[in-house]
Amino acid sequence: MALVVLLALAPHIVVAQEDVEDYRYYKFYKEEQENVLELLALSADSLSALGNNISRHIINWDYQLRTLGYASRGVAKYESVYTFENVAITSRTSRLLSRLGISEEYVMGICGVDGSVGGLKHHIVHSHAPRRLKPEISASLLGRGSLLSLSHRASHSLTKSDVVLDDDWQLSQYINLYTGPDLYVDGLFSNGAEVGVSLGRRFKNNSLFLSAMLPWSRRSVRQATTEEAVMLTQNYGYNPAWGLQSGKARSSRINSTLAPTLVGSWQRRLGMWTTMRLSAAMEVERRGRTALSWCDAMSAVPDNYRYLPSYYTDDDASRELTEAWRYNDVRYTQIAWDELYHTNLIQSDGHAAYFVENRRTNSQHYALNLDFTTLFRGVDIEYGLRAVLRSDRYFKVVEDLLGARHLLDIDYFVRDDATYATKYRNNLQATKLEASEGDHFGYDYRLSQFAVSGYGVARWQKWDMDFELGVDLSTTTINRRGYFEKELFAANRSFGRSRAVMLFPARLNFAWYYNFGRHAFDAQLLISGSSPEAELLFLQPQYNNRLTDSPTLSRCYAMEVGYSFVSQRLSLDATLYLSHYTNECDVLYYYDDLADEYVDAQVSDIKRLNCGVELRAKAQWSQYLSSKAMINLGRHRYVGSAMVVTYADNDNDLVAISRSAIGGCNTAQPELALYADIAYRRMEWQALVSFNYVGLRSVAPSFVSRTERIYTYAPSPEEQDALLQQQRLPAATSLNISLSKRFQLADDTYIRLSLSLDNLLGTHNITSGYEQHRISEVLIAQRKHVRPFANKVMFGYGRTCRVNVSFGF
């Protein structure tokens, strides 16, 4: 009874101070996403790590370490660049092209790539050199992400005779279906299908390639939580994003994607010394992401800070809550869907207190590239033009009213503001305030970006050395168009087109290579200026045309020095890397506890420094036994302080200007990573044992809590240190084993059985985490105490198992 009374009184404690994740827009943290499709692709490939392609070796250890939160050389996975014939594509398209047999190359570092000017980010490069795929059907029992998958791929030569020629038309196809619940994390499931076809031909002076792909998926995703919630439930896969509805599990966070994609290229030799290439890519994506929301009601998120024992200073209340969590009472540990329905049904006017919204993004991406390669007086020159058009429309849709009749499309935070209480309508263009299921509400806007670039790369040899010099000059135009006219920012302040931002990115890189005998040396330099993401150029893109102050390019200065040794049984690589980023920016949206209102914060003058050494080795111990190893030891830190300018969200008035003491903080990228494996291949048996270690890592730091305005507000040095100190995460380790056996049934027919055990030791690894921007004030013995909100973390999977059966014919 005491617990019920406590929760009933909770709404009157700090109703206005909700976590920004609870009420409205919050950033889609990329590190929280489980890349289920990559796991499915690896299962379909079986023991692809045992292949002969060095690119596949690198990708394998990169993938295994990324499951522990690894980022190669301090560069996050989502920053990687994927290209096909020098046009940018998505990671999803890259993976499907690989499944269609299109050759790929994994390029690390800052060297030039496929004729363009290199960048610091890693590249997966595809070119029209398709492999002939033997027909194969593959079935997998996964358990992680989804339960089952079934795939088929094959290629055919379209010839009228029985003789297969190199210049025949080649048709390749790939189909993958997957479905079912996650067996390791409650509330997760994945359903999806992928279809891809490609058609290509090489003939006398021409090469033509076309590919069409249609991926679709619908899956639930995990939500980061606090370590307190995990420890209370003793469930390292605890997921607060689901609950029971009429006795059945229901997730509040469901991601859906449909992305028809076309890519193509045409190459023609124009003479003895010149080749022309025309390549293009088009993707039209429909993406949705549901979330539970509420109006004039208590938070429905079970791990909200006010629902955890640590929030209460009363021992009896804290004890009862602790018991409820430790016994995993789903009424407290998960979303109470039935209670949400009941709350909506008793609303006097039929409006929704709780509802499910769908944050939709309709994207169109078009890329076109025309380049030429010419050999002139011993210099290989590649030059061309590239155009990219990207248009993203963001809007919210009422997904489920949870038994209510309608939703009021108003800004509840403005309505409760005494100054702006009469300007609460989200869209003056609408004829009614009520929104029904399927209606747009909240916000509706488009961000458009058009870029044109010219580039050139020259490669030549002199004194037994190779040189490369590349230049890339671009112009980028970005603007916003609002389809809703928010009453708070009426007319062109929110509706219609914004002022366009024009930036001029540029890159310059130089590379030197020298080989003698079994040894090779290289050195690479890069200077670049890059445009920020479109959403970072607006103070609040959801409903405001206002630009951030002085939009400008971020800059990068990078250098790498490498050495490699190759012999019959051993290959070694060593790379020293250094990259310095300056003038980076970010925009944050959160509830400011000192100002007691929602704010938009522009963070500028961000500086980062990544430096370290990466060692890689591959050894062939015998005819059947081989090993690979990699160690990366670096320092990935913020440098100096950053400027944080905070504006009130309701009127853009200046709230505060302060410097953030972010210098010295880890960028949330691990500073130590180790991979080692041993592989055995004999006859039709294959086995792989690998060990992964990721250490010296921390949660992503908050710029806000480190501002002078916030940490000097704390009354004691100890509490100031708590706001400034960055949580160090424990080292993450995993031991993985894979085993495969191929049974040859006939000349061209076989069955392959594969078994993979990941994280065999069942270690509980935190894969990512981040600091929240909020602080709380607590009165203890009539004395005020200030402390930061608990960090949000995500634990990786424990011991998992995958079984794959493939039939080739």
Regions inferred by a protein language model and the residue ranges of each:
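C-terminal beta-signal and adjacent terminal beta-strands/loops
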Residues: Q17-V20, Y693-A714, K741-F809
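A beta-strand signature from Gram-negative outer-membrane beta-barrel systems
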Residues: N53, I89-S91, R95-S140, G145-S149
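Surface-exposed extracellular loop regions of Gram-negative outer-membrane beta-barrel proteins
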Residues: R218, A224-Q234, T431, T477-I478, ...
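Extracytoplasmic beta-strand/coil segments of soluble accessory domains associated
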Residues: R24, L47-V87
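Structural signature of Gram-negative outer-membrane beta-barrels, strongest in the C-terminal barrel
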Residues: M213, H365, R386-R390, F395, ...
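Gram-negative outer-membrane beta-barrel transporters
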Residues: Q461-D464, Y577-H580, C585, E597-S705, ...
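Transmembrane beta-barrel wall of Gram-negative outer-membrane proteins
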Residues: S146-S220, S252-T275
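Acidic/polar loop-and-plug regions of large Gram-negative outer-membrane beta-barrel proteins
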Residues: S207-R268, T290-E357, Y420-A435
